[in-house]
């Protein structure tokens, strides 16, 4: 997980200011690339290939393509590296940044639908004078841009544009999930293409077969996302989603640690902490408890609003708890944490969904809407909170495309 910025609206000075405004997204390296009017910048949180060779902005061996990238590619993508290493001059041991860049060099825009991971990135084509921007299918990571009068600027967060460039928030647009964009620098044109749609179909299978398939897919998703050169941990809130992820991780990660945030134990209410303790005891996993009170919430509201770039209580209330949890995770030496986000949307767990029968078109469309709107609320808020609180990357296996 990292922070990116760039475009032909930035200057060397303003992009450094933008990177400083989003430095909480990565403290391991901060570098800038310049070519005529094009400037690209990157704050790195090193997770795969910790060497300096994997720092960004990253340029291919010919000097034509340069990438700034925020995200991770999963294990399933390694097969492409084995193929591409035979054709291109890789300089890193296992950098997914280099793999992603050569995926684009080889397959161009076709690569977007081939990618398996969470990502937001931009690639500058020096020869054709184009900037390509892309975001993963569900929008796990935030990505914004400003385009006006032949100028383009992009950043991982709104504050990376509003402060350094003095751009008004209402003029900033979202790079949409499942889309890629191509900015033609010379004729000042911005194209937008949708490369993926959530399947709109209902498959009828016996209940036992459905349960078996879901279990297998979740297990594969967790294993697929277990790619890291740094230790990983897990969020254990006590809910069924985080319990499932934690249980599967415990079978693969030695000395796994879990984290929970709560306002204290209440035996009558049996809140998150109660069930998190029960689950950790059953799985024999150490549980780090982060306890906050009303005073903490009130004194940290301003910081939370700044972190998530939203003042709505539905966004601020969970984020105000995620910030201290992220800080606690960071203080224990972790950069990567797994969580159960996305399960309610994937499985249609919200109460209003049950207003329809499962075969009704309205029911099916409501579930698709939940998934397609995830990036507007939960995903963006959680990512920003976890990065601001402790510079921690959140992985969410329930949002594996196969599920």
Residues covered by each model-derived region:
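Residue-level preference for the first positions of well-ordered beta-strands
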Residues: 231-233, 335-338
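Conserved glycine-rich, hydrophobic/aromatic-active-site segments
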Residues: 65, 111, 222, 304-336, ...
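Cysteine-centered catalytic environments shared across enzyme families
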Residues: 1-309
């Amino acid at each position: 997980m990292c922070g990116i910025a760039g475009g032909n609206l930035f200057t060397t000075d303003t992009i450094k200011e933008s990177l400083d405004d989003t430095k909480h997204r990565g403290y391991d390296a901060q570098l800038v690339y310049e070519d005529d009017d094009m400037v690209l910048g990157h704050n790195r949180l090193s997770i795969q290939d910790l060497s300096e060779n994997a720092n960004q902005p990253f340029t291919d061996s010919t000097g034509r393509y340069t990438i700034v990238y925020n995200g991770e590619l999963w294990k399933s993508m390694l097969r492409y590296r084995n193929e591409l290493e035979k054709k291109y001059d890789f300089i890193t041991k296992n950098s997914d940044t280099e793999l992603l860049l050569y995926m684009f060099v080889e397959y161009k825009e076709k690569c977007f639908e081939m990618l398996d991971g969470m990502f937001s990135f931009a690639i500058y084509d020096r020869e054709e004078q184009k900037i390509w921007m892309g975001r993963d299918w569900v929008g796990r990571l935030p990505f914004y841009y400003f385009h006006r009068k032949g100028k383009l600027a992009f950043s991982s967060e709104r504050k990376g544009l509003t402060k350094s460039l003095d751009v008004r928030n209402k003029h900033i647009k979202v790079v949409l999930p499942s889309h890629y964009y191509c900015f033609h620098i010379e004729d000042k044109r911005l194209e937008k293409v949708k490369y993926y749609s959530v399947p709109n179909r209902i498959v009828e299978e016996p209940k036992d077969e459905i349960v078996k398939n879901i279990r297998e897919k979740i297990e594969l998703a967790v294993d697929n996302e277990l790619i890291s050169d740094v230790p990983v941990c897990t969020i254990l809130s006590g809910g069924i989603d985080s319990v499932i992820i934690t249980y599967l991780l415990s079978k693969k990660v030695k000395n796994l640690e879990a984290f929970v945030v709560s306002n204290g134990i209440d035996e009558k209410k049996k809140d998150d902490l109660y069930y998190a303790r029960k689950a950790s005891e059953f799985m024999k996993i150490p549980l780090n408890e982060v306890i906050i009170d009303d005073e903490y919430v009130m004194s940290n509201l301003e910081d939370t609003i700044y972190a998530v770039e939203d003042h709505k209580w539905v966004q601020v209330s969970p984020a105000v708890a995620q910030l201290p949890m992220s800080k606690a995770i960071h203080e224990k030496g972790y950069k990567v944490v797994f969580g159960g986000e996305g399960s309610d949307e994937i499985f249609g767990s919200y109460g209003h969904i049950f207003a329809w029968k499962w075969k009704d078109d309205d029911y099916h469309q409501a579930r698709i809407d939940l998934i397609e709107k995830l990036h507007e609320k939960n995903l963006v808020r959680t990512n920003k909170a976890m990065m601001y609180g402790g510079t921690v990357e959140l992985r969410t296996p329930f949002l594996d495309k196969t599920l």
